[in-house]
Swiss-Prot record:
Gene it is expressed from: SMAD6
GO molecular function: chromatin binding; I-SMAD binding; metal ion binding; transcription cis-regulatory region binding; transcription regulator inhibitor activity
Alphabetical list of InterPro entries matching this protein: Dwarfin (IPR013790), MAD_homology1_Dwarfin-type (IPR003619), MAD_homology_MH1 (IPR013019), SMAD-like_dom_sf (IPR017855), SMAD_dom_Dwarfin-type (IPR001132), SMAD_FHA_dom_sf (IPR008984), SMAD_MH1_sf (IPR036578)
Nucleus as UniProt keyword: yes
Domain of life: Eukaryota
Sequence positions that bind Zn(2+): C139, C182, C194, H199
Biased composition (Pro residues): 71-90
Protein name as it appears in the record: Mothers against decapentaplegic homolog 6
Residue spans of biased composition, Polar residues class: 29-38, 235-245
SUPFAM superfamilies: SMAD MH1 domain, SMAD/FHA domain
Tissue: Developing heart, eyes and limbs.
């Protein structure tokens, strides 16, 4: 009997799910996109002999059903007497059986959701999952109603697929933020919701450091960074007239005749250490992708910027930029979404401690987004803050983002100009 094409797409999606390396995660809140492994059925079969040698077998734990009550397990057997053999205990077998049951339930509810989708939506979803967001695809809209899993748990569709394909430790829809290009953006109460997991990012709280920044030094979570390098802040004029600017050839759609008629909301400068590479990239659209290599899409391609005699450190860092970031202008401020597979580091006037001689650098893990500039807070700071605390030039509308490499007291690089590859976002006052 022939299987339908839709059934084949559903099976491919199920085999592309993310399986955590550790049961329940590592507890540090780190992005599961770095700590999880996307496996296929073939990969699982190849891993079976090795798992059999590991004793416990490391079964997959389904986070979706973690809170669902199950049968009570018997107490662990007493330890074996010294020199005696360990008696067989039923507890381990029952625990593994329960995990297998939970995995089957997860598969059943996933299939139930995916079989609702049309073939075109399944293609779009599979394209996004297999490219890991390089080709995000279109919106995959489903009714906002929740899926029924017995009487214990009813996850929304976008939460289910977000856990399945990106973040196994995801617990609540409030942790997700729809990207500005998604139809679910700004439509929290709409009748439908997009369930494409690559149309969402995880939120970094503005008042707490993004995970896992505390892993570097628990005592330094709120420790501000020293701003004693007068080259840290540049105005747009200074950046344009910088003697270290090097020419670069790249496609710049922002200079088209139609774009010139509109007002821009920011300029982007790309730096390697103290040298600016290429010209300013002017942004007119609501969002812009800044990347090294992207399978589909347009924006500011850093891979096309040429510079002679690049150091090996810069070359290695450039190779880590990958899909880069998505920078978007939204009603409440400017947001940065980390699309790459490595962390980015952000400094912004609205992330700093007011009236302080130091600044704060935020570490943003892959798959997370952060509000890098808050319009309301910026207006408040410019009316109340004293600028005497700044050492050297200070631009209240400038944001700095370093790829893969941080700076400050936790690193050997004390200043942003010591980072191999970084961006300066020069925001326009005309909002």
């Amino acid at each position: 009997m022939f299987r339908s094409k839709r059934s084949g797409l559903v099976r491919r999606l199920w085999r592309s799910r993310v399986i955590p390396e550790r049961d329940g995660g590592d507890g540090n809140g780190q992005s599961s996109e770095r700590n999880a492994t996307a496996v296929t059925a073939e990969g699982q079969r190849m891993a079976q002999p090795r798992r059999a040698q590991e004793g416990e077998g490391r079964p997959v734990r389904c986070c979706l059903f973690a809170e669902r009550p199950g049968p009570e397990l018997p107490p662990p057997p007493p330890p074996p007497p010294p020199g005696g053999a360990s008696p067989p205990g039923p507890g381990g077998g029952e625990a593994r059986s329960r995990l297998v049951l939970l995995e089957r339930e997860l598969k059943a509810v996933t299939y139930a959701l995916l079989k609702r989708l049309k073939e075109r939506s399944l293609h779009s979803l599979l394209q996004a999952v297999e490219s890991r967001g390089g080709t995000p695809g279109g919106c995959v809209l489903v009714a906002r109603g929740e899926l029924r899993l017995g009487a214990a748990r009813r996850p929304p569709p976008h939460l289910l697929l977000g856990k399945l394909f990106r973040w196994p430790d995801l617990q609540h829809p409030a942790e997700l933020k729809a990207l500005c290009e998604c139809q679910s953006f700004g439509a929290a109460d709409g009748p439908t919701v997009c369930c494409n997991p690559y149309h969402f990012s995880r939120l970094c709280g503005p008042e707490s450091p993004p995970p896992p920044y505390s892993r570097l030094s628990p005592n330094d979570e709120q420790k501000p960074l020293d701003l004693s390098d007068s080259t840290l802040s540049y105005t747009e004029t200074e950046a344009t007239n910088s003697p270290n600017v090097t020419p670069g050839e790249f496609s710049d759609a922002s200079t088209s005749p139609d774009a010139v008629k509109r007002s821009h909301w920011c300029n982007v400068a790309y730096w390697e250490h103290r040298t600016r590479v290429g010209r300013l990239y002017t942004v007119y659209e609501q969002s812009v992708s800044i990347f090294y290599d992207l399978p589909q899409g347009n924006g500011f391609c850093l891979g096309q910027l040429n510079l002679e005699n690049r150091s090996e450190t810069v070359r290695r860092t450039r190779s880590k930029i990958g899909y880069g970031i998505l920078l978007s202008k939204e009603p409440d401020g400017v947001w940065a979404y980390n699309r790459s597979e490595h962390p980015i580091f952000v400094n912004s006037p609205t992330l700093d401690i007011p009236n302080c001689r130091t600044l704060i650098v935020r570490k943003v893990m892959p798959g997370y987004s952060i509000k890098v500039f808050d319009y309301e807070k910026s207006c408040l700071l410019q009316h109340t803050a004293e600028l005497d605390y700044a050492d050297g030039p200070y631009d209240p509308n400038s944001v700095r983002i370093s790829f893969a490499k941080g700076w400050g007291p936790c690193y050997s690089r004390q200043f942003i100009t010591s980072c191999p590859c970084w961006l300066e976002i020069l925001l326009s006052n005309n909002r």
